[in-house]
């Protein structure tokens, strides 16, 4: 038997192999974040906890934006999130707008806003007409 090992081709101890993402209870890939941190020349060394923490933060931000965008889509009676819904979600949330203030979203449009000076003047009805409107 050539090239054999007692584990049948699998690495030793891989019987119950578990990804770092599943260990941390995350959907975002911890291994990929770790690789990108190493390849990005941000520092000479990357600790073991840094990619887990960063993946958790990225997952939280994505979930927050998608939840608000889903609400915007539902308000517009749509079942699919489009860039317009992302734009509305981000710009209507104070903290996300501050974080992504200089980000341009393609096909996002602008927030509906009419300046106060352009609105028609409200004429206040006073006198006996106002008292008879009960």
Curated annotation (Swiss-Prot):
Phosphorylated to form H2AS128ph (gamma-H2A) in response to DNA double-strand breaks (DSBs) generated by exogenous genotoxic agents and by stalled replication forks. Phosphorylation is dependent on the DNA damage checkpoint kinases mec-1/ATR and tel-1/ATM, spreads on either side of a detected DSB site and may mark the surrounding chromatin for recruitment of proteins required for DNA damage signaling and repair. Gamma-H2A is removed from the DNA prior to the strand invasion-primer extension step of the repair process and subsequently dephosphorylated. Acetylated by esa-1 to form H2AK4ac and H2AK7ac. The keyword Transport does not apply. The modification Phosphoserine is found at residue 131. The modification N6-acetyllysine is found at residues 6, 10. A motif ([ST]-Q motif) lies at residues 131-132. The nucleosome is a histone octamer containing two molecules each of H2A, H2B, H3 and H4 assembled in one H3-H4 heterotetramer and two H2A-H2B heterodimers. The octamer wraps approximately 147 bp of DNA. This is Histone H2A. The record marks 121 as: Not ubiquitinated. Residues 1-25 are annotated as: Disordered. GO terms for cellular component: nucleosome; nucleus. The [ST]-Q motif constitutes a recognition sequence for kinases from the PI3/PI4-kinase family. The modification N5-methylglutamine is found at residue 107. PANTHER family: HISTONE H2A. SUPFAM superfamilies: Histone-fold (SSF47113). Belongs to the histone H2A family. It comes from Neurospora crassa (strain ATCC 24698 / 74-OR23-1A / CBS 708.71 / DSM 1257 / FGSC 987). The gene is hh2a. Core component of nucleosome which plays a central role in DNA double strand break (DSB) repair. Nucleosomes wrap and compact DNA into chromatin, limiting DNA accessibility to the cellular machineries which require DNA as a template. Histones thereby play a central role in transcription regulation, DNA repair, DNA replication and chromosomal stability. DNA accessibility is regulated via a complex set of post-translational modifications of histones, also called histone code, and nucleosome remodeling. In contrast to vertebrates and insects, its C-terminus is not monoubiquitinated.
């Amino acid at each position: 038997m050539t090239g054999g090992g007692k584990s049948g081709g699998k690495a030793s101890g891989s019987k119950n192999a578990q990804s770092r993402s599943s260990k941390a209870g995350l959907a975002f890939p911890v291994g990929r974040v770790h690789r990108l941190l190493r390849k990005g020349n941000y520092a000479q060394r990357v600790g073991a906890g840094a990619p887990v923490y960063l993946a958790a933060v990225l997952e939280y931000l994505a979930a927050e934006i998608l939840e608000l965008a889903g609400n915007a889509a539902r308000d517009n009676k749509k079942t699919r999130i489009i860039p317009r819904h992302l734009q509305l979600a981000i710009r209507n949330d104070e903290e996300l707008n501050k974080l992504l203030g200089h980000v341009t979203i393609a096909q996002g449009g602008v927030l509906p806003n009419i300046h106060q000076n352009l609105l028609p003047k409200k004429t206040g009805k006073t006198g006996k007409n106002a008292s008879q409107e009960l």
